[in-house]
């Protein structure tokens, strides 16, 4: 949804994914450019499209490579980190502060219902306008709830790479 929300807000989006199929999916959801981080030089490709660096970098990997990420940020660029609760990566303070960059953590569970309300309104409006579409990876019968949970856990905690979207359970 991050790609679609960024597009709805008017951003130019460069998305990375771990397979050509996932790159194609990101582009289908609105990414202007897509990079397979397993087969391509991400930094070279990003800096080709944004020679001064990017204004915003949204990081959802559990183990963030801050050296790499800060190198891609433009002056006063911002980075949002939304994964890796137990991660302890090295933070390159020098390059970060010299460029006036900032890093922000984002965890939805820290926001109150009142804080989430305007975001929910915007998301509902974009859904109604067709600007957002659900990214469904698979649909499973409700009786396979344990398997669905295991699949989600394998991909969230162990980076299995076998899930690229939401799991829907049907009664």
Regions found by a protein language model. Name each.
Residues 31, 52-55, 96, 132, ...:
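Local beta-strand N-terminus motif with an aromatic residue
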Residues 35, 55-58, 80:
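N-terminal Rossmann-like NAD(P) cofactor-binding module of classical short-chain dehydrogenase/reductase
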Residues 41-52:
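Short amphipathic alpha-helix with an adjacent loop that forms part of the alpha/beta core around
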Residues 71-73:
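Conserved helix-to-beta-strand junction in the class I
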Residues 114-171:
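C-terminal hydrophobic helical "lid"/dimerization subdomain
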């Amino acid at each position: 949804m991050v790609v679609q929300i960024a597009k709805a807000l008017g951003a130019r989006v460069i998305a990375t994914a771990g397979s050509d199929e996932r790159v194609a999916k990101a582009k289908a959801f609105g990414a202007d450019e897509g990079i397979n981080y397993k087969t391509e030089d991400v930094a070279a490709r990003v800096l080709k499209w944004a020679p001064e660096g990017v204004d915003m970098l949204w990081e959802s990997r559990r183990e963030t490579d801050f050296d790499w990420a800060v190198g891609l940020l433009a002056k006063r660029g911002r980075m949002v980190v939304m994964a890796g609760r137990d991660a302890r990566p090295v933070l390159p303070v020098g390059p970060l502060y010299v460029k006036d960059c900032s890093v922000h953590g984002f965890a939805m569970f820290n926001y109150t219902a009142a804080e989430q309300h305007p975001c929910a309104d915007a998301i509902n409006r974009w859904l109604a306008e067709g600007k957002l579409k659900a990214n469904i990876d698979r649909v499973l019968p409700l009786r396979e709830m344990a398997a669905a949970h295991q699949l989600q856990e394998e991909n969230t905690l162990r980076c299995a790479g076998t899930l690229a979207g939401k799991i829907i359970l049907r009664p």
